[in-house]
């Protein structure tokens, strides 16, 4: 006969909701401070690097790239991958772009990008740079969702992306909203900090006054 355990409903709900919230925050909604990417963005770049969809090569259909990401790395539906890729291309929303869409990319006035079957994409030179030293010796790798291949948990950071491009996302009970900052100011602030890790906040604010 199975043993029946007595538990407190409050404790059980708290534990389950906490685990779910952490999973959503870590695996879907929020960026990692180390490379500045959400999981779907990181997987898009990884797929493009693996398939040599780089700035110097011919662009491929967005539909092909979305299918590859969904089938191998990110089983959360094609629309979330397409939306993320279009957002990564939007120069009017990002200080630095990692992908470049060829075709109707949408507009600053709110026009939508064309359907994924009509437009093509490849990495920008900055996107290419994330392939530099992308190996298990440099960054941690884990098995993908069906354990058929490996994927990086973070990308080798080439820029302080989280500050430069900002981020927004809503998880379960957690949200983030970080504005974009001027890339030159951010890089100069990082250089100043590496030269003097006791630099004051006021001194850093003189170099990087605020969002851009």
Model-derived segments and spans:
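Catalytic phosphate-handling regions of large nucleic-acid enzymes and associated NTPases
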Residues: 1-212
């Amino acid at each position: 006969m199975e043993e029946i355990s007595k538990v407190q409903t409050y404790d059980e709900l708290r534990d389950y909701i906490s685990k779910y919230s952490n999973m959503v925050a870590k695996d879907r909604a929020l960026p990692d401070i180390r490379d500045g990417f959400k999981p779907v963005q990181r997987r898009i770049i990884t797929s493009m690097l693996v398939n040599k969809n780089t700035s110097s090569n011919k662009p491929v259909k967005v539909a092909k790239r979305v299918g590859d990401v969904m089938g191998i790395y990110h089983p959360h539906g094609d629309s979330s991958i397409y939306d993320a890729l279009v957002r990564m291309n939007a120069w009017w929303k990002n200080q630095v772009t990692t992908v470049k869409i060829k075709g109707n990319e949408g507009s600053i006035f709110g026009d939508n990008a064309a359907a994924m079957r009509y437009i093509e994409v490849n990495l920008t030179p900055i996107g290419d740079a994330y392939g530099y030293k992308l190996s298990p010796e440099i960054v941690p790798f884990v098995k993908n969702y069906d354990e058929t291949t490996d994927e990086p948990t973070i990308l080798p950071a080439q820029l302080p992306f989280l500050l430069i491009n900002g981020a927004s996302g809503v998880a379960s009970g957690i949200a983030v909203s970080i504005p974009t900052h001027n890339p030159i100011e951010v890089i100069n602030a990082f250089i100043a900090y590496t030269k003097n890790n006791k630099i004051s906040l006021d001194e850093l604010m003189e170099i990087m006054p605020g969002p851009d």
